[in-house]
């Protein structure tokens, strides 16, 4: 059985197992050699000091948050939290050495820690341990990932690591007690809890970031990630148990040290993922308390519908609520777990908001500043900062924000004198701007209805003050009469979840009922349409025979759920004559284009995305009505800002989302053992329009060795040359410059040929071969068995979905035990539709809802017409 078959985050296993037998091992540590050359210092403490809480707290050091890109990452935590798994994921993603301190100690001394201590005594062990750890850090200070044992914090080890954190990222990994117990079965949960409590302070002193490792097994995979169609993907789960952990951990690493040459392979390609949510207009953030998230009282899939971000609300009053009853340890764990669960369940940015305490009670167990500092350690996209803190605290906190964007926040408990027209609000804005906050949030209770309009005047004053270049402003009135201002606030308006929790919503401790969000995202959307800020639009799918398309069901269900009075319909035609008329209608919102018009519509576009240009085909058309947007089309923000507005169409913009859908399927199905590396190989079967998109998707993932095979070899050669020519001319925006010189697309002779002997077997396969020939005969396409010879398996994306179980699907099912993951056409269809939805509406797609609609309406009879829209071989 493949070594990744039954792996859970936190299960100990060798680096060779995780990378695959044919992967290069990390170089051995040279610590033993150093110890032989240099005598061990006898000046260190001879008494082993177990990390046992406050008694071992270290002298405070400023928390460093910005590091050189090549700075080594160090991972610490108690036993059983999953440090080795996380180290493997980081080393694979960033192409770094993986060094484990336990192994380094064994190599240096010839025995394990326990055996060495028993043989030489505690004092000698402490001396040796200190020297081994010191040399380990010195010789691996760059381009490495070091996984430290819990024992490394003994004696002087903690000080070494604490000092190391002044120039390197040190990540403290937490985990729930039950998850740790599953790994360390000889320890009781009570003992584990005691160890965590005793060591937490020391671990936090030694680190500068936190990661909460969510325990997950195969059975806990979300419906969004796990198998959905039992006939095609019943056995994918075991190989993907680390997949979501990888996503979450790499998200934190990007926040800490930035991106890297192959970073694109771990990032989303959806259009709105390239935008900061605070640059868009009329965005919403659903407000969820940490308690509700951890207790699962909220359906997180439902809560995300219609919003652009998730606001995690944290209660700061220690006198009330379960949040604080058990002190700082429980508080940090609660926040960390809630944040991790949100990160696991969404692609939306997360805002951590410290709930406002009107009484400003001085914290007995935890100060607001300390809590804010912990929130920054999690690496959220946004975090609110209470502007009523003193200047020294504000400066200190902002110095530790890292890449997190800060919302300077002032929550007035009473209506300010002179309201929004006075100087007080402007003073708050200028203070936040001077501190370096990226956004400023000001709210106050509603005094009267005119305040809703006074806010508009205040926003204009702010705009004039800094010529539009300062922090963007979030401003609204709270309370029932303030709902109008909340609807018209431009950025990150807090909204209530759409489905009520089993018990009535109550304010967080210190909040008044007036401070709760009083509108849902759907209600806010309906208000914007009712007030003509947004307008109903018509969308369509255009092709030779699209009457059986699933797209209308997906999009119309999404519009309904989000409070958008849009409509999406099919339009079948044999020519583009109707298209010319439809796209000029004043309420035309956008069109999905399918065969045979993906290339024929190219000359009709006024502007093309870089993706559509490189692929040489489009599947998405959106209208442009603003001359300013047309003139500055390099800025995608303008495209999104003019969505949902009618008027004369002045230009047509063509894009391609097929590659995004294929790319997403590859990413979802590519296990951590097969993460993209320079030697990784991809295979595309077919040479039509979807094959073009598949090659582009692989290039964007950083795959440097791409093969294309088609029954007509000349078509494959033509397609390969198309991309090789673009690569030589630097004509692919998604191609990393560092990869360009080594990226090639090669046409194979035939499906009967041997796999090239000097190349690795593919770990990524995309089949664009239709299930029927033009005369209606089944193609019965399968791959040569030898081509699927990857020792770590891989992912196969079968784009055909009529029938859903093709001969290729059956072939892959038979080798799923060897690590092969299957994605089918019903995976790809909604993925590309999510991207189209974003381009059409400027809003995130309700992903689970749209997926559910696909399976709800799918039937082979219903999709009979879809065969006419597939690419020819």
Regions found by a protein language model. Give the residues of each.
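Catalytic alpha/beta core domains of metabolic enzymes, predominantly
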Residues: 388-536
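Phosphate/diphosphate ligand-binding glycine-rich loop within oxidoreductases
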Residues: 536-672, 811
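NTP-dependent small-molecule kinase module
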Residues: 2-68, 89, 93, 169, ...
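Conserved substrate/cofactor phosphate-moiety recognition/catalytic segment
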Residues: 88-134
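Rossmann-fold NAD(P)-binding glycine/threonine-rich loop
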Residues: 623, 639, 773-854
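Catalytic beta/alpha-barrel core
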Residues: 287-289, 309-318, 328-331, 351-357, ...
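Glycine-rich phosphate-binding loop used to anchor ATP phosphates in small-molecule kinases
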Residues: 124-167, 562
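Conserved phosphate-donor/acceptor-positioning beta-strand/loop module used by diverse small-molecule
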Residues: 162-186
């Amino acid at each position: 059985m493949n070594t990744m078959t039954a792996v859970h985050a936190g299960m100990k296993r060798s680096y060779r197992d995780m990378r695959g037998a044919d992967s290069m091992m990390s170089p051995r540590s040279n610590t033993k050699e150093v110890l032989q050359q240099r005598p061990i210092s006898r000046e260190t403490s001879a008494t082993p000091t177990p990390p046992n809480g406050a008694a071992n707290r270290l002298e405070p050091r400023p928390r460093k948050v910005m590091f050189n890109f090549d700075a080594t990452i160090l991972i610490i935590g108690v036993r059983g939290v999953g440090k080795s798994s996380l180290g493997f994921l980081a080393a694979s993603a960033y192409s770094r050495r993986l060094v484990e301190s336990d192994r380094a100690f064994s190599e240096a001394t010839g025995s394990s820690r326990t055996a060495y201590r028993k043989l030489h005594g505690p004092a000698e062990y402490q001396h040796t341990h200190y020297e081994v750890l010191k040399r380990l850090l010195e010789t691996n200070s760059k381009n490495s990932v070091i996984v430290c044992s819990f024992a490394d914090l003994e004696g002087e080890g903690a000080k070494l690591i604490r000092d190391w954190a002044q120039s390197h990222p040190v990540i403290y990994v937490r985990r729930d007690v039950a998850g740790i117990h599953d790994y360390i079965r000889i320890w009781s949960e009570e003992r584990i809890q005691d160890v965590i409590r005793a060591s937490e302070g020391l671990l936090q002193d030694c680190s500068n970031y936190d990661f909460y490792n969510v325990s997950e097994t195969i059975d806990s995979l979300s419906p969004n990630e796990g198998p959905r169609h039992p006939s095609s993907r019943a056995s994918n789960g075991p190989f993907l148990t680390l997949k979501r952990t990888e996503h979450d951990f790499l998200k934190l690493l990007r926040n800490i040290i930035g991106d890297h040459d192959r970073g694109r392979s771990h990032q989303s390609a959806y259009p709105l993922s390239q935008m900061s949510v605070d640059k868009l207009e009329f965005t919403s953030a659903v407000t969820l308390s940490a308690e509700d998230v951890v207790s699962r009282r909220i359906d997180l899939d439902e809560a995300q519908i219609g919003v652009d971000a998730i606001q995690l609300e944290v209660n700061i009053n220690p006198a009330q609520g379960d949040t604080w009853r058990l002190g700082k340890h429980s508080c940090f764990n609660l926040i960390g777990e809630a944040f991790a669960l949100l990160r696991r369940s969404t692609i939306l940015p997360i805002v951590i908001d410290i709930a406002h305490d009107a009484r400003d009670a001085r914290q007995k167990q935890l100060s607001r500043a300390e809590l804010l500092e912990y929130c920054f350690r999690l690496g959220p996209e946004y975090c609110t900062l209470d502007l009523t803190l003193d200047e020294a605290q504000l400066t200190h906190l902002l110095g530790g924000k890292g890449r997190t964007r800060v919302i300077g926040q002032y929550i007035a408990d009473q209506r300010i004198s002179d309201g929004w027209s006075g100087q007080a609000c402007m003073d708050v804005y200028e203070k936040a701007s001077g501190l370096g906050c990226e956004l400023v949030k000001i709210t106050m209770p509603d005094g009267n209805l005119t305040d809703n309009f006074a806010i508009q005047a205040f926003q204009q004053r702010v705009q004039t003050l800094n010529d539009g270049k300062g922090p963007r402003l979030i401003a609204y009135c709270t309370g029932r009469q303030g709902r109008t201002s909340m609807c018209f606030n431009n950025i990150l308006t807090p909204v209530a979840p759409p489905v009520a929790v089993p018990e009535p919503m109550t304010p967080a401790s210190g909040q008044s009922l007036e401070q709760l969000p009083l509108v849902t995202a759907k209600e806010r959307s309906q208000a914007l349409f009712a007030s003509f800020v947004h307008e109903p639009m018509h969308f369509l799918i255009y092709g030779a025979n699209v009457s059986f398309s699933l797209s209308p069901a997906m999009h119309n269900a999404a519009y309904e759920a989000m409070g958008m009075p849009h409509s999406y319909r099919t339009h079948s035609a044999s020519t583009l004559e109707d298209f010319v008329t439809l796209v000029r209608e004043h309420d035309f919102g956008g069109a999905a284009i399918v065969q045979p018009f993906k290339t024929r519509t190219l000359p009709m576009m006024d502007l093309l995305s870089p993706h559509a240009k490189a692929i040489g085909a489009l599947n998405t058309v959106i209208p442009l009505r603003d001359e300013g947007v047309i003139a500055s089309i390099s800025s995608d923000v303008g495209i999104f800002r003019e969505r949902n507005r009618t008027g004369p169409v002045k230009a047509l913009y063509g894009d391609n989302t097929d590659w995004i859908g294929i790319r997403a399927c590859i990413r979802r199905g590519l296990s951590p053992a097969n993460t993209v590396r320079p030697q990784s190989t991809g295979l595309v079967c077919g040479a039509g329009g979807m094959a073009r998109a598949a090659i582009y998707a692989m290039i964007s993932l950083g795959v440097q060795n791409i093969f294309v095979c088609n029954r007509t070899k000349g078509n494959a050669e033509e397609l390969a040359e198309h991309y090789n020519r673009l690569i030589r001319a630097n004509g692919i925006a998604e191609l990393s410059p560092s990869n360009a010189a080594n990226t090639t697309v090669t046409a194979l002779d035939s499906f009967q040929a041997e796999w090239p002997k000097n190349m690795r077997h593919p770990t990524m396969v995309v089949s664009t071969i239709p299930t029927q020939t033009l005369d209606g005969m089944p193609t019965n396409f399968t791959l040569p068995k030898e081509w699927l010879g990857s020792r770590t398996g891989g992912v196969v994306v079968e784009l055909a979905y009529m029938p859903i179980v093709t001969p290729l699907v059956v072939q892959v099912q038979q080798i799923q035990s060897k690590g092969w993951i299957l994605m089918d056409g019903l995976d790809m269809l909604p993925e590309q539709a999510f991207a189209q939805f974003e381009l059409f509406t400027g809003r995130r797609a309700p992903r689970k809802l749209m997926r559910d609609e696909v399976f709800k309406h799918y039937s082979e009879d219903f999709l009979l017409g879809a065969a006419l829209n597939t690419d020819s071989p």
